[in-house]
């Protein structure tokens, strides 16, 4: 069983499909929020997890106290995409407006921010960016999955959805009708002068401001299926799958 940050599930599902075919192995992916994924690792409920950030020093110390040395492999660069309903022709958004909104200040540009889960990696990323510990009381909505965010935004004007970019770059067939009703926004960095969209090229050039590294964390301590899957993702075939999925391989 591998616990996967829900915001990058499409990419890891694609990896698992190829891996299982190639090695005649069975991998069970369990999508969860970042907080739940980390809890599962700490409590030994899962030996392998995919995260959208590295472990913090404090988290590494927690593991070492349990005599566990996690093997951490950086395998891709991902991006957080901001999406809005097509009824608004405006496809631009300044990051400073998002940060002001997260601080509880009203903004003409944003009617509401929609996240997949209050404990998700997208929430913790934007909270860290805005330097806030709690979400504002008004105007922030959260659901259970990136798919629900896409559906909600496609049906509600003025809302801005915060999702993993691979939900757009590798959509499932059932999501296509909803994706037709949303625009992916170009974002202006805090000290930037231009608006940049989350394309593979812009992520590669480092110009898109909401990029993040993806890691597979292995706490199994022995060379099991998890170790094999981590090696596969970081190897040639896995890196080609990353490229095909619209994200950036690390090599």
Model-found features: residue ranges?
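Hinge/lid segment of periplasmic solute-binding proteins
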Residues: 55-68
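Exported/periplasmic ABC-transporter solute-binding proteins
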Residues: 1-24, 28, 34-35, 39-42, ...
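Short beta-strand elements of ligand-binding domains
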Residues: 49-52, 76
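Residue-level marker for beta-strand->alpha-helix junctions and adjacent short loops that shape enzyme
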Residues: 34, 53-56
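Short, Asp-centered acidic motifs that coordinate Mg2+ and/or phosphate
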Residues: 47-50, 159-161
């Amino acid at each position: 069983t591998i616990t996967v940050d829900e915001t990058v599930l499409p990419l890891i599902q694609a990896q698992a499909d190829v891996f299982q075919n190639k090695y005649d192995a069975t991998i069970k992916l369990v999508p969860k929020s970042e907080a739940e994924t980390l809890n599962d690792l700490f409590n030994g409920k899962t030996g392998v997890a995919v995260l959208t950030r590295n472990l913090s020093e404090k988290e590494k110390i927690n593991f070492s106290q349990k005599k566990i040395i996690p093997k951490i492999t950086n395998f891709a660069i991902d991006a957080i995409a901001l999406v809005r309903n097509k009824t608004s022709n405006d496809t631009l958004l300044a990051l400073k407006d998002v940060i002001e909104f997260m601080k509880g200040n009203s903004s003409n540009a944003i009617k509401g921010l929609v996240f997949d889960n209050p404990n998700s990696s997208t929430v913790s990323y934007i909270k860290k960016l805005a330097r806030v510990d709690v979400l504002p009381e008004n105007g922030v909505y959260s659901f259970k999955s990136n798919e629900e965010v896409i559906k909600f935004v496609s049906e509600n004007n003025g809302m801005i959805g915060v999702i993993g970019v691979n939900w757009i770059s590798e959509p499932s067939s059932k999501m296509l009708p909803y994706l037709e009703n949303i625009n992916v926004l170009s974002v202006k960095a805090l000290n930037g002068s231009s608006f940049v969209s989350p394309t593979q090229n812009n992520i590669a050039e480092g110009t898109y401001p909401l990029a993040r590294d993806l890691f597979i964390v292995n706490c199994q301590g022995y060379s099991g299926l998890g170790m094999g899957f981590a090696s596969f993702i970081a190897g040639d075939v896995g890196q080609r799958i990353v490229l095909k999925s619209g994200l950036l391989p690390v090599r």
